[in-house]
Amino acid sequence: MELIMSNIATGLRSLKLNALTNELLYAFQADILEFRTTFGLGVMTEFTTVDDDLHTSLITEEMKEYGEAECHVDRADALVDSVYVLMGRYVHQMGTSKEFSYSLTPILYMVDILIQTSNSFGYDFKACWDNIHASNMSKVCKSEEDAQTTVQSYLSDDIDTDYRQVGDYWVVFKNGDSADIKHGKVLKSIYYTPADLELVLYGTV
């Protein structure tokens, strides 16, 4: 077992990040911290099997969307969303710490590969990220009435949800597992503002 773990550690040290610069990493960490704090999600807290299942289902969903993408807008959206999910897993465990963690290196390696993939298509990854982050922040409900209306909207689609207050906001989330949505996933407010990657990629709508 010690030999196996030693080989794994050596392998992690040999991973080279080509596209994920420190500047990008720290910017991603700050944005994800804002998201997770606003929505009452864990930051540097115990990472449970439930958390692991949720994060895994989210990245699986995004990679499926990437595989099904038929245009640059959908492809860029799936790539950035995938990095957003992976950074969520990372910040859950590391916060905005600049200390290096070999155990979490595979996450950063996956992030790096996704950014390189984005670059290969000529996308401005950071501009796409900023647009999607702003959109993700709009998922929060600004009043309890908005949260209740959002819950009713999901109920009309037979999606069981609930909401909780976090600071000055209310967050709607999936209540219980379903075939394609895990319990605890943050859901969009009815006043959610979709990302506009058409504008980012082409400068037009």
Residue ranges and their predicted role:
Residues 2-205:
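Flexible "arm" and connector segments at domain edges
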